Amino acid sequence: FSSLMRNYTEMRYQINPLNSVYAVLDMTVIPAERPRGPMQSLGGDARMALHAGGTPKHPPLLVFVLGETARSQSFSLNGYQRDTNPRLALENVTSFTQVSACGTSTAESLPCMFSHLGRTNFAKRSNEFENMLDVLQHAGYAVLWMDNQSGCKGQCARTPYVNTSDLKLPEYCQGDECRDTVMLARVDAELAKLPAERRARGTVVVMHQMGSHGPAYFKRTPAEFKKFTPECTDTSLSQCDRAQVINAYDNTIVFTDYFLSRVIGWLKTQEKNSTPAMLYVSDHGESLGEKNMYLHGLPYSVAPPEQTTVPMVTWLSPGFEQLSRVSTRCLQAQRDKPLSHDNLFHSVLGLMAVKTSVYQRERDFFAACEGR
């Protein structure tokens, strides 16, 4: 039970009849925590292959935005009736509508997202393995993790790391919490600290958002982004009308839309010296009162789609399209294709032209659009 509570701490917030059978779920649905053997190396044979479009004029630069608690159903890019993505709608992005998460909590999803194993095998593993970021570094890329959340859950243990709460920038931070835009305020300075010889080959930056972390949704957005009012301003969601909870949550999506547009804007400024691209995907979703459920953390087998279906957005600069020969038009034509976090490891390696025996082309969702 203690293991359950560590992995599903969000459950204590649930306003949900399922709480009464919570102990039963512990016995019947959730596997016991498995013993982990020693760390296993992965992708030691990784190297940079020639990109499909040839030798790059400028090194590739990928920003991987790791979203927090964003659900696909609340993105207007995916058909939500409220305009929560006004800025991304103006960019040449692809928003994938049918993406399944590895889990229903950050602790469960995040390590799985960076693993080569996929959700089913990750849950069964008997050893820990190096991850996507290790393989990228084995190939020679510079890698940076910028964290505006509760840490990287061990995924950046061997990667240069910046915790934004340590930056003490008052224009972005109050106490230990900062707006996600603080990462853009510091990214240039932090990139300059990475080894120059690696940056000359290419760079991958992970930006881990505060995003839509609840239940205090109202704390995630500045006043100018409170588009939907009145919003719930209580961390006990039962004290608010459901409409107020939804307003507060939707405002966090509006701010994420702004942040992602700012990331794209920053990447465009790098085109003189880099070949930029962005990949955004959330770790898990969120319940907002559907069937009287709130927040997240239900065991996967009984979790509703609001907790398991997450937004994923890609942006490729014209230079990156030419380099990778991956067409945004083709990606947009496949936006409703069922995908999952299982695709991330292989898709990022494929996009960055990493050749390794652990890469599986059939799991690379970019591969289907190469040369099309």
For the regions a language model picked out, list residue spans one by one:
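Catalytic domains that recognize anionic headgroups
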Residues: F1-R372
